[in-house]
C-alpha cells in the first residue's frame, strides 16, 4: 500500500453565507470522490482543516478549495499547507463543519487580515530565539506543550486557545513590564493560532510580535535535527498523536478516556488500561464511565483498520 499524504491547511479569507453553504455541501462529495478522510472547519473568516489520502486525491481536493476560495497573496490568505506522510489512515471519516471561527479565540475584534505579527522563516528562527532579548511563547495548550516545545520557551499552561487573551493580560503584560524584552516570538503547530495570537497582542500594545511561518511542522520539515532547537515531539490532531523531528509518528499515543497524550512510561504504569484510564484520569471518571469506555475500546479493537 502506498503511503498516505497528510495535509494540514488554513486560509483567512472572507466567506459569505452562500459560499459557506456551497463548501459544506460540496466538500464531502469531493472527499469521497478522491478517497480523502479528515476534518475541515468552515467559517465566515475562512477554512481550517487536516485531510489525508492518496497524494493525488489530497492535491485534487486542495486544488478544488483554491478554485472555490478568493485567495490572496498575503501569507494568512493563501491556502497555507503543511504536508507529511502516514503508513495508514489517520482519520476514521471525513467531516466538514460550520463554525463561528476556524480557530476559536472568542475575541471578535481580532482579525489577522487587518493586523498580524511579522512572519519569521524557519531558517531565521534559531537566531531569533537564541537572542536573549527575545521572549519566546508557545501558544499551544498544556497537553501539547507537555510532550515537546522549543528550548527555553514560555508555556502559558492554557487548557484552550480561548484562555490565551486572559493569560496575556494577567500574566504576560506584567512579565513584559518587569523584563522589558525587545520583542516577542511565538509559535504553534501549523501557524494558524499565531495568526490570531499575534493579532491580539499587536492590537493591545504588547510591542513587536513575530511568529514562526508555518509553525512547528514547517520548522521540523526544513531544519536539520542537529541544528534544531526543538525538543521532544509535536502533538497533532489525528490518530498519529505526535510527530518526531522526521515528521514520522512518535512514541506517544492517546488515552481515549481523557484525550491526553501518553508516553511509553505512562503506558507502562500499572494503573493504565487501554481506552479506559491512565495516570492523568484515573480519579476523574466513575465506574459506570469506565465500563462505557471499556465497551467502546472493545468495539475499536474489533473494527478492521
Swiss-Prot record:
Record-linked SUPFAM superfamilies: Rhodanese/Cell cycle control phosphatase
Oxidoreductase among keywords: yes
Coiled-coil parts of chain: none
Chemical reaction(s) catalysed: uridine(34) in tRNA + AH2 + O2 = 5-hydroxyuridine(34) in tRNA + A + H2O
Pfam families assigned: Rhodanese, UPF0176_N
Rhodanese domain sequence ranges: 130-228
Swiss-Prot/TrEMBL GO biological process terms: tRNA modification
Gene3D superfamilies documented for this protein: 3.30.70.100, Rhodanese-like domain
Keywords attached to this entry: Oxidoreductase, tRNA processing
Catalytic residues, chain numbering: 188 (cysteine persulfide intermediate)
Alphabetical list of InterPro entries matching this protein: Rhodanese-like_dom (IPR001763), Rhodanese-like_dom_sf (IPR036873), TrhO (IPR020936), TRHO_N (IPR040503)
EC number: 1.14.-.-
GO molecular function: oxidoreductase activity, acting on paired donors, with incorporation or reduction of molecular oxygen
Job description of the protein: Catalyzes oxygen-dependent 5-hydroxyuridine (ho5U) modification at position 34 in tRNAs.
Family as reported in the entry's similarity comment: Belongs to the TrhO family.
Protein name: tRNA uridine(34) hydroxylase
Annotated organism of origin: Synechococcus sp. (strain CC9902)
Gene that this polypeptide is encoded by: trhO
